[in-house]
């Protein structure tokens, strides 16, 4: 799983898009290492869009945290983020691996 800031720092659409692009680039690198990459934001955004209502808080973190419980490891990217920190906490509590750089991510 890739955990990184998405909404931290405001609702600037360009910033969110740049952050999501960074997560997706990391996901490609993890895929090339032989793992199946997962990004909570990528799972939640289509559901949020389909709702056609303000369900961001209802959907984003519950989906991301549920995914965290089903993944084997997490790559924590970027700066401060309460959501990403919550995801990492799930991994830590479960005794799963937490990586902070791609350089330390093992081949699958």
Q: Model-found features: residue ranges?
A:
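Conserved catalytic or regulatory cores that recognize and/or transform ribose-phosphate-containing ligands
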Residues: 1-108
């Amino acid at each position: 799983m890739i955990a990184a800031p998405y909404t931290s720092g405001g609702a600037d659409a360009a910033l969110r898009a740049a952050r999501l692009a960074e997560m997706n680039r990391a996901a490609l690198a993890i895929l090339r290492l032989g793992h199946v990459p997962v990004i909570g934001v990528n799972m939640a955004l289509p559901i949020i869009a389909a709702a056609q209502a303000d369900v961001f808080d209802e959907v984003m973190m519950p989906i991301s945290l549920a995914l965290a419980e089903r993944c084997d490891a997490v790559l924590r990217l970027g700066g401060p983020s309460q959501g990403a920190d919550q995801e990492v906490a799930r991994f830590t509590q479960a005794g799963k691996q937490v990586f902070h750089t791609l350089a330390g991510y093992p081949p699958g």
